[in-house]
């Protein structure tokens, strides 16, 4: 919120800055945020001219999100300070610990999804 963005808008910008082209479903899976929040953020960013949606050629139900040129610039200004902090943390903790952390988080997410789906 310090950078003038809601959490869900921040993660959308962050993910698209790093991955260029993602579907709403992929953003939801990567962030574990509610689909409604991600959808709201995508529509807001689209309406502000920062993001475009493009339908998949093979499946009309699938839409890819892309940052516009203005959106990339906006994302860099808003997200770069967070990327800089990430880089400092990686340097302090070391690559091995970060890899372990990512493996543990992935395991946690898989188990969470499994138990959630069982309910």
Predicted stretch roles:
Residues 97-99, 113-119:
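Short acidic DE-rich linear segments
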Residues 1-37:
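N-terminal helix-turn-helix DNA-binding core of bacterial DNA-binding proteins
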């Amino acid at each position: 919120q310090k950078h003038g963005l809601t959490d869900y808008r921040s993660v959308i910008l962050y993910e698209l800055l790093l991955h260029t082209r993602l579907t709403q479903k992929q953003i939801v899976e990567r962030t574990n945020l509610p689909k409604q929040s991600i959808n709201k953020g995508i529509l807001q960013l689209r309406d502000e001219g920062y993001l475009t949606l493009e339908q998949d050629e093979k499946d009309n139900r699938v839409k890819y999100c892309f940052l516009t040129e203005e959106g990339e610039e906006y994302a860099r200004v808003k997200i770069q300070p967070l990327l800089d902090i990430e880089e400092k943390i990686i340097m302090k903790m070391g690559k091995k610990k970060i890899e372990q952390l990512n493996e543990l988080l992935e395991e946690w997410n898989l188990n969470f999804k499994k138990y959630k789906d069982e309910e």
